[in-house]
Amino acid sequence: MKHIKKILAAGICLAASLYLTPAMAAYEIDPDYTMKYNDPGKIEQRYRWHGPYEVKSVVLSDGEAKYGNYKYKVWYPVQQAGRERPRPLVITLNGTGGSCDKDEPIFRHLASWGFVVAGNTDAQTAPGFSAEWTLDQALAANQDSKSPLYHQIDEKKIGIVGYSQGGAGAYNTLEGKDGDKFKTMVTVSGVTESIGKKLHLPVWIYDPSKVTIPVFMAAGTGILDRKLITPLDEMKENYSKIQSKTAAMGRRKDADHLDIQTAADAYITAWLRWQLDDDIYAKRVFTGKDPEILRNPAWDNAEVRNPETTQPNRLKSELINGSSRKFGG
């Protein structure tokens, strides 16, 4: 019965995707995407570029029925001999029509900063099943002496990142059997309640008040995100319902649904470096007396909350970002 429910949920998502505008269709990310952005934030600039690690990849499985017939692939940092240590794991969920093959450049970028990044080719990720299967296989590889991932993953430091309908998938994964294994979540233009209702997709509707881990929510100010996928009022409502004491949100100016993954990539990397790798430089984007995201003119509607921040208000961000300056991306 459980397997039948999974098939039905995936079928409903697939049917609904036929009604989505072609403008929302996934596309292959340019391997040189980091070159197109002129980031005004100093810390943002640092995490825009590739990190210090060479990156390799390995396919965990491909076309196995028990894993939904998807391909599962991992990108991981190559560590210096004698200096190896288990690295944080990041599970990714695609947007509608997306795949790890199309998004490979951003996964390589994240892995270059010391993360083991696991993705798949599931184009309908909202139910969260493929995220669970990705995690299962990554953790199995971590215990397999024949795998290049053997003892490479820190199983106490696992994050989840969901783009578009994958945002709903991230919430659903947290409510699943492995929810307590995740230490942080990032949603990137995550679908909100209104679009789920318009498409009659209950699997796209979730309860943010059940989330107790640190969360970063990013979106763009372009028309698709603003009017359809991640409207500001609903994004704020979701943010307010998150139960974690640590959270942040922001909307990247001049970015829309199709390029928000690359536009927000630097701050997503910084968030994960802070939350999963204790990077004290990266945390300055979101903490302290003057968090960079609140004064970065390339970001709008930014908010932060955490025990270390003394000025967690969006008013400052809105006043600073009120100009009409435009930035690359």
Residue ranges, per PLM feature:
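The feature captures the conserved acid-bearing segment of alpha/beta-hydrolase catalytic domains
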Residues: K183-I260
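Bacterial N-terminal signal peptides that target proteins for export
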Residues: M1-A9
